[in-house]
Amino acid sequence: MKIYHLYRQQHLNMTLIDAWEFFSSPYHLNDITPDFFHVTITSNVPEKIYAGLMISYEMKAVGGIPMAWLSEISHCDEPRRFVYEQRIGPFKFWSHEVCLTQQQNGILLEDIMVYAMPLGWLGQLINSMLIASKLEHIFDTRRDYLQSKWKAEINASLM
């Protein structure tokens, strides 16, 4: 099984508390994802996330095909870090860690994604032909939105 990594970081001119409130709310997903994604939360989500919280979504990720996604907040260290992991969805494995670090003039946002594709070599081919570029597009859209809203400095890498 091939494991893929996607890492992004940005400096944002906002407070740690404001950053936590924004990034820990799944209701902001449509603000920071491309229009084609159409994320709809299908479960009740409390005001504050916590470890063990399960959140279900519907989205249109590839070719407008609707898909269900169930994620669990596996770790939550308010206001610095949370991790959500796919429990049901298109990936064999998906983990997205969001880290917020206070700095002199705002915060450092780090997105650390680790994922694996299903279907063995076919999944690897699909990743190289479609999924990796879609993920880049999703996080480019996120970067651009954040940059326009909070003057972000950008660093990205895909492994």
Regions found by a protein language model. Give the residues of each.
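Hydrophobic ligand-binding cavity/cleft-lining segments
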Residues: 1-50
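Generic structural detector for well-ordered beta-strands
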Residues: 7-13, 40, 58, 72, ...
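Beta-strand elements of well-folded, non-transmembrane domains
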Residues: 12-14, 61-63, 75, 90, ...
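A short, structured loop/turn motif at beta-sheet edges
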Residues: 15-16, 74-81, 99-108
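Glycine-rich portal/gate segments that line the openings of hydrophobic small-molecule binding cavities
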Residues: 41-88, 141-149, 153-158
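Beta-strand/loop substructures that line and gate deep hydrophobic ligand-binding cavities in soluble
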Residues: 86-137
